[in-house]
């Protein structure tokens, strides 16, 4: 649950000076914070599953340093082989799923954005907060998360039904808001509540990988 407190005077001043409804802005903002929290809880649970003993095999670490004289243009495409390795690890573990998404930290996203096959998501007009879908790579949804360890990434399979699920999010109360309460000192209060269930069903549909030495110069013999 979240609780917002504000003065009626501030609400009136904002409307008179700028024609902006403070209440509408508040509901949109705190509703976004609730969604952000739900997303982060789910992603953290998926990451924990991907690093567990029940997950598919860990992907071989990719050393991002080019060999002496090797152009970065060629070096960066090596990461595609790691993604195929991760997808095969999931298929080998489960015999039924391949990687359909990549959840990555900022350094991993930095590399992905430079790949020719990356297709950025269009139409993003809102200021990003927390994890966000940045596009697709070879048909896999790419999620960049500033709260994830910058050099780590998780690959996973999103199935078409519960029978193929690795993780389930079940909203019970999507978003509930209380009526606005105004006290005698002209202070207003409004509460927000959301409730959901989260469950890892099959950790084998996830695997973890990492990169190292991004921007670390050339490899030495």
Task: Tell me the role of every PLM-derived stretch.
Residues 1-17, 22-28, 73, 77-79, ...:
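Sequence/fold signature of self-assembling virion shell proteins
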Residues 3-5, 35, 65:
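Basic side chains
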Residues 22, 39-63:
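Short, glycine/acidic-rich hinge or "gate" loops at secondary-structure transitions
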Residues 36-41, 90-97, 221:
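Secondary-structure transition/capping motifs at alpha-helix termini
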Residues 57-85, 89:
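Gly/Pro-rich turn-and-neighbor structural signature
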Residues 31-38, 42, 194:
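Structural signal for hydrophobic packing residues in well-ordered secondary-structure cores
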Residues 100-105:
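Beta-edge loop/turn motif
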């Amino acid at each position: 649950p979240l609780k917002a407190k504000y003065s009626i005077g501030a609400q009136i001043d904002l409307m008179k000076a700028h024609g902006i409804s403070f209440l509408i802005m508040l509901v949109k903002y705190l509703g976004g914070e609730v969604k952000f929290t739900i997303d982060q809880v789910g992603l953290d649970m998926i990451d924990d599953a991907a690093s567990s003993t029940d997950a598919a095999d860990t992907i071989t670490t990719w050393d991002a340093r080019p060999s002496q004289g090797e152009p970065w243009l060629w070096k960066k495409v090596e990461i595609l082989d790691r993604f195929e390795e991760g997808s095969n690890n999931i298929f080998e573990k489960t015999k039924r799923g391949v990687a359909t998404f990549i959840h990555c930290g900022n350094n991993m996203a930095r590399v992905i954005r430079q790949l020719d096959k990356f297709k950025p998501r269009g139409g993003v007009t809102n200021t990003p907060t927390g994890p966000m879908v940045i596009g697709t790579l070879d048909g896999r949804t790419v999620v960049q998360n500033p709260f994830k360890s910058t050099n780590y990434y998780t690959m996973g399979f999103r199935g078409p039904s519960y029978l193929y699920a690795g993780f389930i999010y079940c909203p019970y109360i999507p978003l509930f808001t209380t009526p606005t309460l105004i006290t005698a000192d002209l202070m207003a209060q409004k509460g927000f509540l959301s409730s959901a269930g989260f469950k890892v069903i099959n950790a084998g549909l996830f695997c973890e990988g990492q990169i190292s030495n991004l921007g670390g110069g050339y490899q030495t013999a």
